[in-house]
Structure formats: C-alpha cells, structure tokens
C-alpha cells in the first residue's frame, strides 16, 4: 500500500497480531498495489444506509424549498450549520427549525426529532435578533461578501494556514505552465540545484471581485438608552461600489436604511426609494446596490475555483505558520484600510467582553464528567473536548504572548522577575524558570525549563488515559521571544490560604520533599494511573524518616480542589531518571560554587527515560517471561516428543514472542498464562531517598537494578538497532530535524543522545554518513536555539528583529561578511532602552558565536564538533531549522551566504526567488516587476552588505506545546477497519474505515493534524480496497490539511504529495501526477537538500511515469539520476545498484542507445555474478539480456527486428523484496514503436491492468520473492 502516516494507528498496528500484507506494509511513499483484491465496490457507493435520508427544507424567501441529505447521527445544530453555509441560504444566521409546527431544540440529535424520516419537511423560521446575534450576523456578512480582508491576528502569523495545493504547477503569472507538446512537467528539472524558495509561496493571485467598498460600525454606535428599549441594536455605515453611503440600523426585526448622516443622527427608517428593510443584512445590501448581486456572484465563482479546504478558517487547531513569507509590498499580503478591523473585538465579544471570559477549569472538568457509555455520548464528549482544548490553547497562547511582552501586570510585582505570576482571561501564567529555588539542586532554571516541558507530556498522557474522577488542569507551554511561559487553568483552591497544620498538597511531596502527604482517597486513582504507565508502588521517606507508601513518584502531586475534585499536578516525573546518563555527565553543585568538571557539567538533573522506552523494555521483559514459561513446560514434558508451543498472549503483548511455533502434533495450542507477569519501574530511585529497614533496602536495590537495566537496554539495544535499521533502509530516512526527533521519540530515544548517535554513525557507509550530517545540522540548530534564546530573553521586543538578524549573520553569513553589524536604531535605543535590556548581542562575531554554539553542543549532547560546522550548501536547510525552532517568519528573498551570491543576489527583486531550474531568469524578473508594486516605504537607509537585515525578520510567532488528548473512538474505528481489511473482510472493513473517517471529521473538525493523518492512512487502505475515486479524493484532502496544520514544507506534507502523485498516475492522470511529484521533490530540496537517500524510489517512480507518457529519453535521464544516488548510498557493487543498472539498461534500449544499454547490462551482470553467484536466477536473467542486447548492438537490423517483435522486457523495482531482475514477464513496453517509429498490433504502453502497472511503478513484485533480502531502494517507510 502507498503509505500510512497515522502515527497512532502505526503503534496500535505494531501491538496487534496481524500478519497480512495490508497491515505489514508500513510504507509512506511507495507501493500502491492491489495486494488485497477487492471486487465489491458497494459499501461506499451502494445504497444509503437507513440512518441517512433526504428531507426538504422550507425557506421564507427564494428558492423557498431545498432538498438536503441528513444523518440521524448528527445533531440539529449540525444541520443548522449546513443551512448557514449553503449557497442558497447564505443570508440566514438567526433562525430556528420547526417540524410540523413544533420548534426543534438545536442541541438534540436528529434521531430524537419525533416522526422525522425520508421526505419530511423542516421549516426555517427567522428569529428576532438580539445584540449578540446582530454582531455575529454582521461579522458573517462581512466575511461572505469579502469585506473582512485579512485580520491582523496577534497569535496567527503572516499567511498562517497557507496551502499551495491549488497553485502547484502554476507559473508566476498564476497560469498553468506550458510544457509544449513534446515536454513533460519534469522537462527542466535540475537534480543538483539547491532548493528554490519560490516553491514555498503561491504565485500572485488575481484580486477577488469587490461587492462593496466598505461596511463598518457607524460613529453613532452604540444606540442610546431610549432607542435600545425600542429594539435598536447597532448602527452601521456602508459605502457601495456606486460610491453611495448608507447608514443602517440593526433592529430586532432585521436591518433597514435610516436617515442618519455623518453629521446628523436620525436612526428612523428612511423614506422614498431607499426605504428598504430586510431580515438579513445581505438581502438589504443587494437591494441597495445595483451592482452588488453581479459582484457577489463573481465573488462566489472566484472562491469556487479554490478547494474549499484551502479557504476555511481553522477552528480546532492552530494553523501552521510559514517560516518564509512574502515581503510587506507583495500583492499576497496587501494591507488595506478597513475601519471594522479595529471594531472586530467588539463585534466578536461585545462591550463588556464577557463573551470571552470563561471558567476554563470548570469547562474542562465538567466535560470529563459527561457520560460516555453510548457511542453517541462518546462522540459528543470527545467532540466537545477537542473544541475546548483548541479554544483553551488559543486563549492561553494569546495571554502568554502578552506576558512575554510585559503587557500584563503581575500579581506579585515585588518578586524577582522569574518568580512573577500572572492571571489573565482566567488562566494562570508563570515563567518556565526556577524563580523560587524549587530546582536548586536539580539544575535551577535549566531544570525548571525541562520540567514544564515534561509536565505537558505528562498531562497529555493522563488525559489520554481518561481515568474517571482523576482530573488535570489545562496546560500549555509557550516559547516566545526567548522566554518559556506556562499557562494553566486555575484549579479551585490552589491559591487558598490553608490553616496551620494543613498542607497545600494532599498527596505527594509538600515543600520540596521534606513533608510527604498521602491522602488515601488518591490511592485508587493513582493506582490506575501507575498501572497504565508502568510506575511501581513504592515507599518514600520524609525529613523525619517516616515511611509513606506512594502509588506514583513523590514529585507527582495530588490536590483536592475546593470543588471536591481530585487533581493530579506536576506530572513531569512519570518515568525514572536516566541514571546511566546522570552518573556519566552530572555532578552535584558544590557548596563553594566551584565550576563543575567539563565531563560532568550537564545543565540539569531532569534527564528521565521516555515513556516509549519504558514500554519497549516492558515488552522485552514479557518476551523473557513467556520464553521462561515455555521452557518450564517443555522441561515437564519428559519422555515425550519435545513440543514447540505457540504462546497466545493478550493484546497487551502485541507481538509474536521469539521462538513461538505451532505445535506440530497437538490438536490444541499451549497457552502461556501471563497473569503472573508484572513489570513496573520505581521513578524515585536515585532521587535522594534513603530506605530505613533491611527489607526496604533490598527492595530498593532491586528497583535500582531494574532501572539500570532499562537504561542499559536503551544504550546497548535500542540505539544500535535503530542505527542498523536506518543503515539497512528498514525505516524511512528522516528528512529534517522534526522527522529525526519524531523517529527518536517513537523508539524511546531522548534528544540528548544525538551526540552518541552521531558518533555511532561515523562509519564509511553512505547512509550513515548522511545520518551523521543530518544529526550534526540538528545539533547546531538546537545549540543555536538555546544560545539565541538566552540573548532574546533580555531584549525589548522592538530590538528582537535586530538581535535575530545579527545572530543569523554570525551563524550563516560569515562567508559573506566576516564582521557583521547589528542594526539597532540608536535613537530608539536611547529613548526606550532600560537597564534590564541586554545589548551584548551587538558585540558578537561569527567566531564568538561559533564558540558558544560548539560549547552548547558539547554541554547538551556530549559531542565534539571538531572542525565540523555549517555544511557548505546546506545553509538554507539550517536557516529553516532555526526559524522553525525560534518561530521566525523571514522575508522571502534569495539570501546570499557567500560574497558572490550576496553581490549577485542584490539585484534580485525581493518577491521573486532566484532562477534555478533552467527557465529564463529575465522573463521572471520582468513578470515580478510588473506584478509587485514598488516599495512604498520611507527613503531607504544605507545598510551594511550582509546576509540578513533587521527588516528581513518580519514576525516572530510562538512555538506551542499543548496537552490535547486524542480521540479514542476515532482511533478504535480506524483500527477495527484496518483489522477487518487485514482479515479479508473487505466490505465490513470499508464500512468501518468510512465510519472512522466520519468520526475523525466530527470530533476534530476537518482541519486538524490528526484528520490529515487519517485521510492519508484511509486513502491508502481504500486504494487497496479498489475504491480509487475515494482514495484519490482523500489523498488531495490529506495534502491540503497537512499544509494548513503542519506546514507547506513539513515532512508529512512531502510524503502526502508523493502519495497523491502515485494515486493520480493510477487514475490515468500521469501529467498531473508528475506535477505533484516534482513539487514534492522541490520541497525535499528545501528541507534536506539534493540526493536524499530515500529519493531513489521517487526518481524511479517518475521515470516509469515518463515511460507511460512515451517520454523515453527523459525517462532514461531519471533512471540515471536514481542510479547515481543509489551508487552513492548503497555502493557501486550492491545488489540495489545492480538492479537499477538492469532497469537503466532497458531505459537506454528504449532510447535507442544500444551501446550504453550493453555497458549498463554488463555492469549489472558482473555485480550479480560476484555477489549472488553464476547460478542465481537474477544473474542468469542479466546474462540472457546481455547476450540479447550485445547481439542487437552488433547487428542494427537484428535490433530493429527484435524490437519490432516486442521482446524488450521490463522488471519490477521491488520494495520490501530485493531489487533484482525477476523471471520473464509479459511485454509491458512500447519498445517497438519507440525504436521503429511505428505501432504494432500488440505494441501498447501497457497490456496489463492499471493495477499491475502501478505495482510495477511502486515496486511490488507479483512473483515469489527471492529468499535473500537486501536493502533499498525501497518504499519510504513510515518512521516507526
């Protein structure tokens, strides 16, 4: 199958005993095939299920009646929302629905509406407005008619939620690229060029038609008291396209034109021809402006050209912020005058702003307490939870940004800055620093910073477990302008002054670890938590050596709120310390404050094991337990034939145990009872606890040994195995820092082991060298991030851009200017700088910055960079990594990293990217000059010649860590569908998959990262079920949602584009497929650079697609490019290279280069012979081809004759199986027509079904695989 990007379902799949092909193929990019045959196409395309039927909606205005298909599983408010969004019913926003004269409650399910069935009639009844409804109606109408423009949002950055999907394949004028009759979309692709940043932005868009010049709240707003009593709600002023100004009254009955003007106030209805009234403002504007209706229709048509998902606002997720954005003068980011923009906060939340003040904690906890027995209850509960977390994350981040900028007064202004706390919008804020000395012995500020990050992960873990009656506070961590800020919902009673003798905490450590509380009501709750997280029940001792038995870590607190609920707090220590790392690299701070030795100066003691590692070690212990049990049973069976039983384990075990085999002669299988197995780790060992009794000491020693064994498992098993799998191509090779850290985390490997992995990767193998280069780049980016944060933290916001630009110049621009200058405005500096501002960044030089970053890498990752530094040619990739980590949004232009490019780049217009792929540069410059308006800034100041300027840093956005739980219901449905498909229950599987899709969309909303992953996974599964139309549609959606929620150049977005290309090709749209493949490859160059180890398969796919288009010469070029990378990655004498040589020889033959074909085939034959031996069938196949091609080269006439008979054959590029020639297959090429210039009766591009061709493209061999297994080229594997 093509790909599976749903991480959760991947881990669930790993824990299931599924052995069929669908579930075993974790490939992300490659191998769309028909492994699971499916002939039934009902299910998705058959009759509608019983709970879905059509009804009629009766309207008060034209068209008076519309049909609508509904599902009884939906709520009435879902139907209401659908009516609001339909083109014929745009104008309605304040209404209710009636059925048979009875009003329907908006908050019930449609299934609860009495007598509602097929062909029922629901009536839309317009309601009187109140002030809130009027405000929301005005907002909605402004958005509908395109008058709202772009909001300047403090949280969302420039072009947040951008999608390129609709503009891929368009040139800079916004029109499809002309390839010419003989060219393909890949015609001018340059394999070796660096990434072109123009591929990260859409071409300039044609402006949308204007329906109205402006509409805003009037200066006469709000209505005076005596008019409010008469039903006046708002006063508006509108300027039509005919330049007529109208003052409008918003009344409880609707909207009408009044007699007011800018100078006089008279809100009574106007007389004469303009005496107009309508319930909807949209209808009133249509009546007022003769051109409105036509313009509005044009606007709808303009918007209809775009995929709806690209323009919907994100409501349940924070949109991705691009790191490269257009300059302020670009047509993509024009800033238009709009008075209503300043009024939006009033329109959204009213005069008192009470609409937005929410009791977050009560909302979180009451949602948790909702019923979850029935499926519809679970759907409603999870849907509300998802929306609530999204709203909270949004509000908490906005508040954190205000705290970072110093715009909120602290509750304790006399305290030190790091100890200050804030409350804003019912959210409690504090700094991720050790302001009160809590972590004095653990590493101070560094320890506190790590602890709050781990706390978010802990809160998310507890939220996912969903333990009844155990509650958590809403938690968000925001990194902004160098500061780390924690936002938490306020737990009732947390600030309460306790009586003497009462403790602030009811379970766990109080005031350090001197006092330990152990309220018994927490025991059953923490017991469930600890069992799920493999935390061992253990004793701890307070300052008086009194023994307390705790279910969790002493650091994990329990608090009984004044609302009577039990809260779990401080969840940063759910796993044990990584004692091996701490003993090697940490030493306790000395009382004399002497400097620590360099080998023991790790910045903090909060180095814990990851939960994934604890789980993986637990599975290892289970395997050992089962093996011992099997051995015991085998020893008991003396005198009889030795049995090799198969262990039947629960889903908990997940994987086949080593040595399991079916009992040959036994009618029943032996079972291993694992109820006696238990595994848990004590999180408080090595944390200063001193056992008192001998019994406790012995138990404690055992616990310590177990934790040491887990640490040893990480260093001796997990990390080396991961490196081996990367070397052998068993897992997808990471593209960037994000995909690298994701790969490590899924294996349970902490980021602090980057240095160790780099050392272990320092071997001659090309894949390992590529891994080492990527890790070094990531360490530099992270080291720079830590240093940059330390400088940004103490700089006022107006100087942050100058600070960042100077730091970037020192990091990346040293070759262009060895002595960069910080561009701080001295006059502003004199006027507003305070003693707290630290301008030491101005004194930094490239040498001093390099020294600081190298020191950070040595400190945090225990790695000596030596002579290594930023790799030449990879400056753009490092700039991207740094920008994403710091939340930078840079102006799009060609940044010169050397003196030559800096000089040449000066002439390039800012909106345009430099020319790379072989087109005329001059034409593009001209186009950009005509499209982009000239700079309207103040006269240019003479700036020093350096790579980055302060003006290039257009914005800094927050980097957010949040604790939203996943939907268990949607995950369960997806997994059930996957299992059914794997067990060959195709119809049931398809039904479950589509149900899972519906659940994902219902619970998360459509625009959400989890939905993107679900679309991706489901598109692959549905393709294998032969539902190609649905698979293709979902593949398109996966791309758009990935772009908008993860980023246009996120690694998952690239894989989604590659998947989409394969599906388009399978559907017969090869040209469109190549456009998407090219875009993915261009993104790949920006993310990683040229020659990514896993791009071999993609280049092969493109080559085969070109052959399908009969572009034989171009196809040959792509095969050769793939071969070149394969030789670099796998070596010139590997079987992978031999197989690609074999394919390239065939491509050369199709291109009529017989001499080249013979040479390539001879190389292939020699490698097969040397590696596999003369008798291997692959060697014989190559030998047969070599003879045939040699004869053809000797006799041109014989060659043409052979080609005319269609004897040239092609082999599969295998994915899981080795890359080798296979046994003879039917002719699939039009070789005869290519060489002889004519078509024969049977000479078609493909005589097999498209599924078979797709198998060939993707590399899934239809024959029995050879037993010897080799590495890539292969499918891009989902990173486990």
Swiss-Prot record:
Q: Which family does it belong to?
A: Belongs to the CLU family.
Checking Gene3D superfamilies in the record gives:
Tetratricopeptide repeat domain (1.25.40.10)
Superkingdom of source: Eukaryota
- Tell me the keywords, alphabetical order: Cytoplasm
> From start to end residue, where is composition biased (Acidic residues)?
32-43
Please describe what this protein does. mRNA-binding protein involved in proper cytoplasmic distribution of mitochondria.
Q: Please report the name of this protein according to its UniProt entry.
A: Clustered mitochondria protein homolog
Compartments it resides in:
Cytoplasm
| Segments for region (Disordered) | 1-49, 169-189, 633-669, 905-943, 1214-1280
Q: Which InterPro entries match?
A: CLU-central, CLU_dom, CLU_N, CLU_prot, GSKIP_dom_sf, TPR-like_helical_dom_sf, TPR_rpt
Lineage of the species this protein comes from: Eukaryota, Fungi, Dikarya, Ascomycota, Pezizomycotina
The Clu domain is annotated at 338-582
Q: In what ranges is there compositional bias, type Basic and acidic residues?
A: 649-669, 1245-1261
């Amino acid at each position: 199958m093509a790909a599976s990007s749903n991480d959760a379902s991947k881990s669930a799949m790993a824990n299931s005993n599924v052995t069929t092909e669908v579930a075993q193929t974790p490939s992300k990019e490659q191998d769309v095939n028909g492994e699971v045959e499916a002939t039934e196409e009902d299910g998705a395309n058959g009759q509608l299920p019983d709970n879905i039927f059509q009804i009629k909606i009766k309207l008060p205005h034209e068209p008076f009646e519309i049909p609508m298909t509904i599902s009884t599983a939906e709520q009435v408010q879902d139907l209401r929302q659908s009516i609001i969004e339909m083109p014929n019913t745009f104008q309605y926003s304040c209404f209710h629905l009636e059925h048979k004269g009875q009003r329907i409650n908006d908050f019930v399910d449609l299934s609860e509406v009495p007598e509602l069935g097929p062909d029922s009639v629901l009536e839309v009844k317009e309601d009187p407005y109140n002030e809130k409804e009027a405000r929301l109606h005005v907002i909605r109408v402004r958005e509908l008619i395109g008058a709202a423009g772009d909001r300047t949002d403090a949280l969302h950055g420039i072009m947040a939620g951008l999608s390129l999907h609709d503009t891929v394949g368009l040139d800079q004028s916004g029109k499809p690229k002309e390839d010419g009759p003989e060219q393909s979309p890949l015609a001018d692709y340059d394999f070796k060029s660096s990434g072109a940043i123009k591929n990260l932005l859409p071409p300039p868009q044609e402006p949308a038609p204007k329906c109205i010049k402006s509409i805003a709240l009037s200066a006469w707003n709000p209505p005076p008291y005596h008019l409010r009593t008469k039903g006046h709600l708002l006063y508006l002023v509108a300027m039509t396209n005919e330049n007529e100004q109208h003052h409008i009254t918003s009344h409880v009955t609707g909207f009408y034109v009044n007699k007011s003007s800018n100078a006089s106030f008279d809100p009574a209805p106007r007389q004469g021809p303009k005496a107009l009234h309508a319930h909807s403002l949209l209808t009133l504007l249509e009546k007022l402006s003769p051109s409105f209706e036509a313009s509005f229709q044009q606007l709808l048509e303009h918007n209809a050209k775009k995929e709806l998902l690209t323009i919907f606002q994100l409501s349940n997720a924070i949109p991705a912020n691009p790191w490269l954005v257009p300059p302020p003068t670009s047509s993509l980011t024009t800033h238009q005058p709009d008075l209503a923009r300043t009024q939006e906060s009033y329109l959204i939340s009213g005069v008192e702003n009470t609409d937005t003040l929410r009791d977050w904690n009560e909302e979180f906890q009451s949602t948790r307490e909702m019923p979850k027995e029935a499926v519809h209850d679970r759907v409603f509960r999870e849907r509300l939870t998802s929306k609530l977390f999204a709203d909270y994350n949004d509000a908490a981040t906005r508040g954190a940004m205000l705290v970072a900028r110093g715009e909120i007064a602290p509750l304790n202004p006399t305290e030190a800055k790091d100890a200050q706390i804030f409350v804003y919008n019912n959210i409690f804020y504090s700094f991720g620093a050790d302001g009160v000395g809590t972590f004095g012995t653990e590493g101070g500020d560094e320890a506190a910073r790590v602890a709050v990050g781990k706390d978010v992960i802990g809160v998310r873990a507890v939220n996912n477990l969903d333990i009844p009656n155990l509650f958590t506070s809403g938690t968000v961590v925001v990194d902004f302008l160098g500061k780390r800020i924690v936002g938490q919902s306020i737990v009732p009673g947390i600030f309460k002054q306790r009586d003497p003798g009462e403790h602030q905490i009811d379970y766990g450590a109080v005031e350090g670890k001197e006092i330990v509380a152990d309220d018994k009501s927490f025991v059953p709750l923490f017991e469930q938590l600890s069992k799920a997280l493999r935390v061992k029940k253990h004793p701890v001792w307070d300052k008086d050596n009194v023994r307390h038995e705790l279910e969790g870590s002493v650091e994990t607190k329990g608090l009984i709120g004044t609302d009577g609920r039990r809260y779990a707090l401080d969840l940063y220590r759910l796993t044990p310390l990584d004692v091996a790392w701490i003993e090697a690299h940490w030493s306790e701070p000395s009382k004399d404050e002497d400097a620590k030795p360099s080998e023991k100066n790790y910045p903090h003691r909060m180095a814990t094991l990851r939960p994934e590692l604890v789980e993986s070690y637990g599975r290892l212990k289970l395997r050992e337990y089962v093996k011992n049990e099997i051995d015991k049973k085998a020893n008991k069976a003396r005198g009889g034939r030795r049995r090799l039983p198969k262990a039947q384990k629960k889903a908990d075990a997940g994987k086949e145990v080593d040595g399991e085999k079916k009992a040959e002669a036994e009618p029943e299988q032996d079972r291993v009872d694992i109820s006696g197995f238990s595994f848990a780790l004590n999180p408080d060992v090595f944390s200063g606890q001193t056992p008192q009794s001998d019994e406790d000491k012995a138990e404690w020693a055992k616990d310590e040994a177990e934790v040491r064994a887990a640490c040893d498992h990480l260093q001796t098993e997990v990390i080396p195995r991961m490196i081996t799998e990367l070397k052998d191509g068993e897992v997808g090779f990471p593209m960037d820092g994000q995909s690298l850290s994701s790969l490590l985390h899924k294996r349970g490997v902490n980021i602090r082991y980057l240095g160790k992995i780099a050392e272990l990767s320092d071997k001659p193998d090309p894949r390992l060298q590529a891994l080492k280069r990527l890790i070094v780049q990531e360490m530099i980016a992270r080291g720079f991030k830590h240093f940059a944060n330390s400088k940004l933290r103490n700089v006022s916001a107006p100087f942050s851009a100058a600070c960042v630009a100077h730091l970037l110049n020192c990091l990346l621009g040293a070759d262009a200017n060895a002595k960069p200058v910080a561009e701080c405005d001295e006059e502003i500096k004199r006027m507003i700088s305070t003693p707290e501002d630290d301008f030491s960044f101005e004194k930094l030089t490239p040498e001093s910055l390099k020294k600081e970053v190298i020191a950070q890498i040595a400190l945090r990752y225990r790695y000596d960079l030596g002579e290594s530094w930023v790799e030449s040619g990879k400056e753009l990739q490092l700039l991207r990594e740094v920008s994403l980590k710091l939340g930078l949004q840079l102006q799009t232009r060609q940044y010169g990293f050397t003196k030559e490019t800096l000089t040449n780049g000066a002439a390039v217009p800012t909106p345009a990217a430099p020319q790379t792929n072989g087109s005329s540069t001059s034409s593009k410059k001209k186009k950009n000059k005509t499209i982009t308006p000239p700079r309207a800034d103040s006269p240019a100041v003479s700036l020093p010649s350096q790579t980055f300027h302060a003006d290039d840093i257009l914005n800094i956005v927050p980097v957010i860590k949040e604790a939203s739980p996943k939907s268990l219901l949607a995950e369960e449905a997806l997994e059930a569908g996957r299992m059914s498909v794997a067990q060959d229950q195709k119809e049931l599987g398809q039904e479950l998959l589509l149900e899972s899709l519906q659940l994902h969309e219902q619970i998360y909303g459509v625009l959400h990262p989890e939905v993107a992953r679900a679309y991706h996974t489901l598109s692959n599964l549905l393709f294998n079920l032969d539902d190609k139309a649905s698979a293709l549609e979902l593949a398109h959606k996966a791309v758009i949602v990935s772009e908008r929620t993860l980023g246009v150049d996120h690694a998952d977005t690239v894989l989604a584009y590659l998947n989409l290309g394969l599906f388009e090709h399978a559907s017969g749209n090869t040209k469109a497929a190549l456009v998407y493949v090219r875009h993915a490859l261009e993104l790949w160059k920006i993310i990683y650079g040229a020659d990514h180890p896993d791009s071999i398969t993609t280049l092969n796919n493109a080559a085969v697609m070109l052959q399908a288009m009969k572009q034989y010469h171009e196809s040959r070029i792509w095969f050769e490019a793939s071969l070149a990378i394969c030789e670099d990655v796998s070596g010139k004498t590997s079987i992978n290279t031999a197989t690609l040589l074999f394919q390239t020889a065939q491509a050369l033959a199709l291109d009529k280069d017989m001499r080249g074909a013979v040479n390539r085939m001879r190389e292939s034959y020699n490698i097969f012979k040397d590696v596999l031996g003369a008798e291997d069938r692959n060697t014989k196949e190559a030998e047969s081809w070599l003879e045939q091609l040699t004869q053809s080269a000797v006799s041109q006439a014989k060659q043409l004759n052979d080609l005319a008979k269609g004897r040239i054959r092609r082999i599969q590029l295998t994915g899981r199986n080795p890359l080798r020639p296979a046994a003879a297959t039917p002719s699939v090429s039009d070789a005869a027509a290519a060489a002889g210039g004519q078509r024969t009766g049977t000479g078609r591009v493909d005589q097999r079904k498209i599924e078979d061709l797709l198998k060939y493209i993707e590399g899934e061999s239809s024959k029995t695989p050879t037993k010897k297994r080799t590495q890539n080229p292969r499918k891009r594997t989902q990173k486990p």
